[in-house]
Amino acid sequence: IFTELTAELTAELTAELTARKKQYEYYRDTLLTFGVHREGTFETKWRTLGEVCGLQAGKAIPAIEISPVQTKEYSVPCYGGNGLRGYVKTANQQGDKPLVGRQGALCGNVCYATGSYYATEHAVVVSDKGFFNSRFLYHALVHANLNQYKTAGAQPGLSVAKLEKVKIPVPEKEIQDRIAKVLDNFDAICSDLNIGLPAEIEARKKQYEYYRDMLLTFAAADDIILTDRQTDRQTDRQTDRQ
Protein backbone atom coordinates (compact mmCIF):
# COMPACT_ATOMS: atom_id res chain seq x y z
CA ILE A 1 0.00 0.00 0.00
CA PHE A 2 2.91 2.38 0.69
CA THR A 3 4.20 1.77 -2.83
CA GLU A 4 0.78 2.63 -4.25
CA LEU A 5 0.55 5.81 -2.17
CA THR A 6 4.02 6.94 -3.26
CA ALA A 7 3.19 6.31 -6.92
CA GLU A 8 -0.11 8.16 -6.57
CA LEU A 9 1.55 11.16 -4.90
CA THR A 10 4.27 11.28 -7.57
CA ALA A 11 1.63 11.29 -10.31
CA GLU A 12 -0.34 14.07 -8.59
CA LEU A 13 2.71 16.28 -8.06
CA THR A 14 3.92 15.74 -11.62
CA ALA A 15 0.46 16.64 -12.95
CA GLU A 16 0.46 19.79 -10.81
CA LEU A 17 3.85 20.84 -12.18
CA THR A 18 2.75 20.20 -15.78
CA ALA A 19 -0.45 22.19 -15.26
CA ARG A 20 1.44 25.16 -13.81
CA LYS A 21 3.93 25.13 -16.69
CA LYS A 22 1.11 25.14 -19.23
CA GLN A 23 -0.58 27.96 -17.35
CA TYR A 24 2.66 29.96 -17.36
CA GLU A 25 3.17 29.37 -21.09
CA TYR A 26 -0.41 30.42 -21.82
CA TYR A 27 -0.09 33.73 -19.97
CA ARG A 28 3.36 34.36 -21.44
CA ASP A 29 2.10 33.83 -24.98
CA THR A 30 -1.03 35.90 -24.33
CA LEU A 31 0.85 38.82 -22.79
CA LEU A 32 3.52 38.85 -25.49
CA THR A 33 1.23 38.50 -28.52
CA PHE A 34 0.63 42.18 -29.12
CA GLY A 35 -2.14 43.48 -31.39
CA VAL A 36 -3.93 40.12 -31.41
CA HIS A 37 -5.40 39.79 -27.93
CA ARG A 38 -7.25 42.49 -25.98
CA GLU A 39 -9.68 42.74 -28.96
CA GLY A 40 -7.03 44.52 -31.00
CA THR A 41 -7.13 47.65 -28.86
CA PHE A 42 -3.53 47.35 -27.75
CA GLU A 43 -0.77 48.02 -30.28
CA THR A 44 2.98 48.38 -29.96
CA LYS A 45 6.02 49.02 -32.08
CA TRP A 46 8.05 46.17 -33.51
CA ARG A 47 11.78 46.53 -34.06
CA THR A 48 14.56 44.23 -35.17
CA LEU A 49 16.93 43.02 -32.48
CA GLY A 50 19.76 44.76 -34.30
CA GLU A 51 17.97 48.12 -33.90
CA VAL A 52 17.28 47.87 -30.19
CA CYS A 53 20.02 45.59 -28.87
CA GLY A 54 23.70 44.91 -29.22
CA LEU A 55 24.44 41.26 -30.00
CA GLN A 56 27.88 39.78 -29.56
CA ALA A 57 29.15 36.23 -29.21
CA GLY A 58 31.28 35.45 -26.17
CA LYS A 59 34.86 34.20 -26.18
CA ALA A 60 36.25 30.68 -26.37
CA ILE A 61 37.80 29.18 -23.26
CA PRO A 62 39.61 25.82 -22.90
CA ALA A 63 37.53 23.14 -21.18
CA ILE A 64 40.37 22.57 -18.71
CA GLU A 65 39.79 26.09 -17.37
CA ILE A 66 36.14 25.35 -16.50
CA SER A 67 35.26 23.72 -13.18
CA PRO A 68 32.02 21.71 -12.92
CA VAL A 69 31.55 22.93 -9.35
CA GLN A 70 31.79 26.38 -7.81
CA THR A 71 34.77 26.92 -5.52
CA LYS A 72 36.55 29.90 -4.00
CA GLU A 73 38.97 29.96 -6.94
CA TYR A 74 36.44 29.04 -9.64
CA SER A 75 33.62 31.30 -8.52
CA VAL A 76 32.45 32.95 -11.76
CA PRO A 77 29.48 31.35 -13.62
CA CYS A 78 30.34 30.32 -17.18
CA TYR A 79 27.55 30.17 -19.78
CA GLY A 80 27.65 28.22 -23.03
CA GLY A 81 25.12 27.47 -25.73
CA ASN A 82 22.73 25.68 -23.37
CA GLY A 83 22.93 27.74 -20.21
CA LEU A 84 25.27 27.29 -17.26
CA ARG A 85 28.30 25.23 -18.24
CA GLY A 86 30.42 25.51 -15.09
CA TYR A 87 32.62 28.01 -13.27
CA VAL A 88 35.78 29.92 -14.18
CA LYS A 89 38.24 32.26 -12.47
CA THR A 90 37.51 35.54 -14.25
CA ALA A 91 34.50 37.18 -15.92
CA ASN A 92 34.19 38.69 -19.39
CA GLN A 93 30.67 40.10 -18.94
CA GLN A 94 28.91 42.33 -16.45
CA GLY A 95 25.23 43.14 -15.93
CA ASP A 96 21.83 41.45 -16.12
CA LYS A 97 21.34 40.24 -19.71
CA PRO A 98 19.70 37.49 -21.76
CA LEU A 99 22.04 35.01 -23.44
CA VAL A 100 21.11 33.09 -26.60
CA GLY A 101 22.66 29.73 -27.49
CA ARG A 102 24.06 29.80 -31.01
CA GLN A 103 25.25 26.28 -31.76
CA GLY A 104 23.88 22.75 -31.61
CA ALA A 105 20.42 21.21 -31.66
CA LEU A 106 19.30 23.51 -28.84
CA CYS A 107 20.54 26.74 -30.44
CA GLY A 108 18.08 29.56 -29.79
CA ASN A 109 17.83 28.50 -26.15
CA VAL A 110 17.58 31.62 -23.94
CA CYS A 111 18.90 31.97 -20.39
CA TYR A 112 19.32 34.97 -18.10
CA ALA A 113 22.64 35.90 -16.52
CA THR A 114 23.18 38.38 -13.70
CA GLY A 115 26.15 40.10 -12.09
CA SER A 116 29.60 39.06 -13.30
CA TYR A 117 29.95 35.99 -15.52
CA TYR A 118 31.75 34.48 -18.49
CA ALA A 119 30.04 33.94 -21.87
CA THR A 120 31.67 31.42 -24.23
CA GLU A 121 31.71 31.63 -28.03
CA HIS A 122 28.57 29.47 -28.12
CA ALA A 123 26.48 32.13 -26.36
CA VAL A 124 25.30 35.44 -27.82
CA VAL A 125 25.12 38.23 -25.24
CA VAL A 126 22.08 40.47 -25.81
CA SER A 127 22.71 44.01 -24.53
CA ASP A 128 19.79 46.43 -24.39
CA LYS A 129 20.33 49.86 -25.98
CA GLY A 130 17.92 51.53 -23.56
CA PHE A 131 14.59 50.20 -24.83
CA PHE A 132 13.83 47.39 -22.40
CA ASN A 133 13.23 46.08 -18.95
CA SER A 134 15.81 43.27 -19.10
CA ARG A 135 13.39 40.68 -17.74
CA PHE A 136 10.78 41.63 -20.33
CA LEU A 137 13.45 41.27 -23.02
CA TYR A 138 14.27 37.80 -21.72
CA HIS A 139 10.63 36.68 -21.84
CA ALA A 140 10.16 38.21 -25.30
CA LEU A 141 13.16 36.28 -26.62
CA VAL A 142 11.87 33.02 -25.13
CA HIS A 143 8.50 33.67 -26.75
CA ALA A 144 10.16 34.39 -30.12
CA ASN A 145 11.17 30.71 -30.47
CA LEU A 146 14.59 31.59 -31.89
CA ASN A 147 15.37 27.96 -32.66
CA GLN A 148 13.22 28.29 -35.79
CA TYR A 149 15.90 30.53 -37.35
CA LYS A 150 18.72 28.00 -37.09
CA THR A 151 20.63 26.81 -40.13
CA ALA A 152 20.12 23.21 -41.20
CA GLY A 153 22.94 20.68 -41.13
CA ALA A 154 24.76 18.17 -38.98
CA GLN A 155 25.64 20.98 -36.56
CA PRO A 156 22.75 23.50 -36.50
CA GLY A 157 23.78 27.10 -35.86
CA LEU A 158 22.34 30.54 -35.25
CA SER A 159 24.40 33.49 -36.47
CA VAL A 160 24.45 36.97 -34.95
CA ALA A 161 23.56 38.39 -38.37
CA LYS A 162 20.39 36.31 -38.49
CA LEU A 163 19.42 37.18 -34.92
CA GLU A 164 19.78 40.89 -35.67
CA LYS A 165 16.95 40.60 -38.22
CA VAL A 166 14.45 39.01 -35.82
CA LYS A 167 11.62 41.39 -34.87
CA ILE A 168 10.34 41.70 -31.31
CA PRO A 169 7.75 43.99 -29.66
CA VAL A 170 8.88 47.17 -27.91
CA PRO A 171 5.97 48.39 -25.73
CA GLU A 172 6.11 51.26 -23.27
CA LYS A 173 8.39 50.69 -20.28
CA GLU A 174 5.47 50.71 -17.83
CA ILE A 175 3.80 47.90 -19.75
CA GLN A 176 7.08 45.98 -19.92
CA ASP A 177 7.46 46.24 -16.15
CA ARG A 178 3.96 44.90 -15.52
CA ILE A 179 4.32 42.01 -17.96
CA ALA A 180 7.76 41.08 -16.60
CA LYS A 181 6.42 41.05 -13.04
CA VAL A 182 3.54 38.71 -13.90
CA LEU A 183 5.73 36.32 -15.89
CA ASP A 184 8.49 36.33 -13.27
CA ASN A 185 5.92 35.34 -10.64
CA PHE A 186 4.81 32.38 -12.74
CA ASP A 187 8.45 31.53 -13.43
CA ALA A 188 9.15 31.49 -9.68
CA ILE A 189 6.18 29.19 -9.03
CA CYS A 190 7.37 26.73 -11.68
CA SER A 191 10.91 26.84 -10.28
CA ASP A 192 9.65 26.18 -6.75
CA LEU A 193 7.65 23.22 -8.00
CA ASN A 194 10.66 21.91 -9.91
CA ILE A 195 12.69 22.03 -6.70
CA GLY A 196 9.91 20.86 -4.40
CA LEU A 197 8.70 17.93 -6.50
CA PRO A 198 11.86 15.75 -6.26
CA ALA A 199 12.26 16.66 -2.58
CA GLU A 200 8.66 15.72 -1.79
CA ILE A 201 8.94 12.44 -3.69
CA GLU A 202 12.23 11.63 -1.94
CA ALA A 203 10.68 12.37 1.46
CA ARG A 204 7.74 10.05 0.73
CA LYS A 205 10.10 7.30 -0.46
CA LYS A 206 12.10 7.56 2.77
CA GLN A 207 8.88 7.45 4.76
CA TYR A 208 7.79 4.34 2.85
CA GLU A 209 11.19 2.68 3.34
CA TYR A 210 11.12 3.51 7.06
CA TYR A 211 7.74 1.87 7.66
CA ARG A 212 8.61 -1.04 5.37
CA ASP A 213 11.82 -1.72 7.33
CA MET A 214 9.98 -1.37 10.64
CA LEU A 215 7.34 -3.88 9.59
CA LEU A 216 9.95 -6.31 8.31
CA THR A 217 11.89 -5.91 11.56
CA PHE A 218 8.77 -6.67 13.58
CA ALA A 219 8.07 -9.69 11.39
CA ALA A 220 11.62 -10.95 11.82
CA ALA A 221 11.47 -10.38 15.58
CA ASP A 222 8.16 -12.23 15.75
CA ASP A 223 9.70 -15.20 13.92
CA ILE A 224 12.53 -15.25 16.45
CA ILE A 225 10.08 -15.18 19.34
CA LEU A 226 8.05 -18.02 17.81
CA THR A 227 11.21 -20.02 17.20
CA ASP A 228 12.33 -19.48 20.81
CA ARG A 229 8.94 -20.61 22.08
CA GLN A 230 9.05 -23.72 19.93
CA THR A 231 12.53 -24.48 21.24
CA ASP A 232 11.37 -24.02 24.83
CA ARG A 233 8.43 -26.37 24.25
CA GLN A 234 10.67 -29.03 22.75
CA THR A 235 13.03 -28.68 25.71
CA ASP A 236 10.13 -29.01 28.16
CA ARG A 237 8.88 -32.14 26.39
CA GLN A 238 12.30 -33.74 26.50
CA THR A 239 12.57 -32.91 30.22
CA ASP A 240 9.16 -34.44 30.93
CA ARG A 241 10.11 -37.64 29.13
CA GLN A 242 13.19 -37.96 31.27
Annotate each language-model stretch with its function.
Residues 1-242:
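Charged, alpha-helix-forming regions
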